[in-house]
Amino acid sequence: MLKRIATLILTILFTQIIIAQDIVIVGQVLSAESSEPLQAASVWFKGTNLGCTTNEEGFFLLRSNTPQRTLIVSVIGYQQRQIKLDYGKDQMIRIYLKEDISILDEVIAMPKQDEAILLLKNAYKNRHSNNPENVVNISTTMNNLTAINLTNIQQKALQRKLFKDLMSGAIEQTDTTFSLPVYLNQSIYNLQINSDSTLKLLNNSKLNALNIFPAEHWQQIIAAYTPDINPYKTYSTILGHNFMSPIAPNAKLYYNLYLADSTTINGRKNFQIRFSPKHNQGLLFKGHLWIDAETYAITQSDISIPSHTSVNYLNNLHYSFTTESFGNSIFPNNEKQGIGLNINLYPSKNMQYFGALLSEERSYSNTTSTTDTLSIRIKESNIEIPIDDKLEATWNKIDSLNQTRIQQFSAWLVDIILNQYLHIWKVDVGPVLNLFHFNQLEGASPRLTIRSGESFSPNFTVGGYYGYGFKDQYYNNTLISNGLHSYGGNIQWRFGPTRRNILSITYDHKTERVGHDDSDIYAESRVNDIEHIGNAWVMLYRPVSVHMRGRIAAQYQYEKPGFKFKINAFTQNIYANRFIPLIHKGAEVPYYSHIGLRTDFRLSWQQSSLDYFFHRIYLASKYPVVHLTAEGGYIKIPASSANEPYHSLFGKFGIYAQQHTALGFGKIHWMLQANAVVGNAPFPALVMARTSRTSYRHDTDFMLLGSMELMSNYYAALTLRYQTRGYIFGYIPYVKKFGIREDLIFNIGYGYLSDKYTTDNILALPANLYNINQGWNKTPYIECGFGFSNIFKLGDIAFVWRLTHRNSTNPEAQNFAVKWRIGIDF
């Protein structure tokens, strides 16, 4: 979700920023001898400071808002050239440079590749002992500087009336474009790293950011999406993608590797290994490493990505570090990384897009060994290390931007998108998507929902809703009401030092989809009901099974990083309707009563979340998220003219796990679910396979099953999607630049329905349930398919076939379908 938010913020702020109509010079610099492109050549207009460097393919682009006469091109090893320009005209030129014979004798000859491979093998073999992440018994001072800037903003765009007030916070660059500082944080820590723990004490800090998010949310988002680059690891994860290290066991299959140089670093001999990708399809680095000749530790690095790297919105990346030795250990003394993003839904090298630059620098000082880890502890110093005064101007620029109208509008709009509430004085109206409902039972149903806002009380809220469905209600073919009323209320209170505890009391009288009581597990960050205005068109396309319920619930919730616990006690009545009748021993009953207690344990690893007003948004994690649920229930079916009241007990248990992570050069998305219902439960409490209601798909749903087609009291399911890096489209000329990826899809579900549920001794199964003959008990349901994702970086399409139970009589069942989805991904 934060991927969508980040793109949204940039778009909101600068939707109308376009390329200025300046004088533009586009060209390519080549070697006169070999016609190969020359990278990193300096190109500038004579007599000005307007310049740039060529990219990996030798291309450059220069702009000037005044006409220029002469262009100068220079690169080490070649003779400098001056190019006469057509005064005042845009030009596309090709420039050839001759080698400078006078320095050819200084060029270092590169020995065989085998020597580089041997060094890298030894570096990999010793990776655990040399990895700075594994160094213990040291103390150090870390100075961390992180900045985010919006980049490549044209002057003429800032002169427009809508964006004119942004000039107060703009910073002019050497290429005549402007940047806008978004976030700046300098923090100084005292660290002590022991074998069993790391002590981290904040010495001094200063942070400023656009008020689109609270400061702590900025820090969490940046921490979640900052690249984790470590050449000692086989893969480094960048924006959810795995990039292979040049010291990985199979690196020689993907990299060109050369032993380029040797020198002395920290008094020890080191060898320089240069590396570059062998082909354009993999996620690989280029650059060089310095490796210690004795310990095979990496003492210095300079790493970047090739220009052809196919990761959405990733324009460039650079990472470097240097080290110092103390005793037998090597530890960094400086780390730098920068990641450049741009908004380029359509690939074009000649089109310049605004983007963002995230830069981070960490410097370490006063690093010493500690011998007694039990007695030595960091103590807070009375003398704070000062913050860099040179950054004061940037902090002031951010303050200026926070006063602009466009920033204030952007903050308001982002808040509505994330939390879906309109703040009116001390009252919140929303969620916005809940203001209108539509389903086959209610028909069109406008709804008013309000609550007390955070400005009324930061730790308490009370609210309610009322809705009216315009569809007449019938029971046994008799009109019982004109329309259907929905209403309810909620009281919530959060308490404790960190507000991790929440108590709530809720009353609901509303329609709900049958069999989707686990929706809060699969859509944890959602604030709206499952039947809302955004899904209204779905009901027009394909009706789903819903029933009315009246429910009173009391819930306690506790949450801390990595762990969440909920316990919910409730009593409810589930009402029959003309679509889903309730039949007990041959007689229809108007409702049944259900008293229950449900617990949910949520486990996660290295996952952050944004804590809003009684709403939490979970950020992406490469590790699984697991839910363990248990429920005990008592039901009562009222007496009818033919039957006495019926009472029973049942238990329901579940495990849910899902993960979205990089695997090799691709990505894998999987969901595992297993449930068991014991005792005697009414059919709405059984387990129903999640189904896709329309041609729009979700990774956690079966795509071809009909509503309530697979219902059981013992159930297991696995949905799996693997996304490649473009093994087919990545090799097709002209098409590969669009970054289309291939998807492989496999979904399997098995449900066992016990004999006792095939009769009406509890409640008769509805007629549209097609497992009533227990046909699913012997054969699992399987569907598979393939698809294409990252289409225009906005969505994907999938072709899916049903492999088993192809003769289903469910009118909603499909043996083949084309599914689609819209989503922003890196």
Task: Locate predicted features.
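A short, solvent-exposed loop/turn motif at the edges and junctions
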Residues: 45-46, 72-83
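Structured extracytoplasmic
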Residues: 101, 110-270, 276-284, 349-437, ...
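Short, ordered, surface-exposed loop/turn motifs in non-cytosolic proteins
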Residues: 23-25, 32-47, 66
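Bacterial Sec-dependent N-terminal signal peptides
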Residues: 1-28, 43, 104, 666-674, ...
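A short, amphipathic beta-strand motif
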Residues: 25-31, 58, 95
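Exposed, low-structure sequence patches enriched in small/polar residues
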Residues: 237-243, 248, 369-826
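Extracellular beta-sheet/turn segments enriched in Thr/Pro/Gly and aliphatic residues
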Residues: 86-111
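Short, acidic Ser/Thr/Gly-rich low-complexity loop/linker segments typical of extracellular
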Residues: 48-59
